């Protein structure tokens, strides 16, 4: 292999398009991306979905996904374990370990888009 697994242009966009289309259909108006229609959303898997949108060239949708995370982050820096239909779905625990993965997703988006304005947001 002569490049990173997901180096730009390594795979044709048609390869990813069905997944990207699924993510676009699943994404809610508030930017959250549940596991499936009517399912819950957890920040970890949500970031994976946002990364898929970035890879698929859907930068606006990916940025909306990251804005949802910004808007739902709790004062102590954590997130609830799960959300559903815009509400907290699991108040039994909060997750601080999501922070590193969310930062990774945002960095990934920046590496693809070079959008410094988004980083400053």
Predicted regions and their residues:
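Low-complexity, Ser/Thr/Pro/Gly-enriched N-terminal "stalk/linker" regions
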Residues: 1-44, 55-68, 72-79
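Aromatic-rich carbohydrate-recognition surfaces in CAZymes
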Residues: 42-46, 53-62, 66-121
């Amino acid at each position: 292999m002569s490049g990173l697994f997901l180096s730009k242009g390594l795979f044709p966009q048609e390869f990813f398009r069905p997944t990207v289309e699924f993510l676009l259909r699943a994404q809610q108006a508030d930017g959250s991306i549940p596991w499936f229609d009517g399912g819950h959303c957890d920040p970890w898997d949500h970031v994976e979905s946002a990364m898929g949108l970035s890879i698929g060239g859907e930068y606006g949708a990916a940025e909306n996904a990251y804005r949802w995370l910004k808007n739902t982050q709790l004062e102590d820096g954590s997130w609830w374990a799960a959300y559903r239909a815009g509400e907290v779905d699991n108040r039994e625990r909060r997750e601080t370990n999501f922070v590193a993965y969310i930062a990774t997703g945002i960095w990934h988006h920046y590496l693809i888009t070079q959008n410094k304005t988004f980083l400053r947001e």
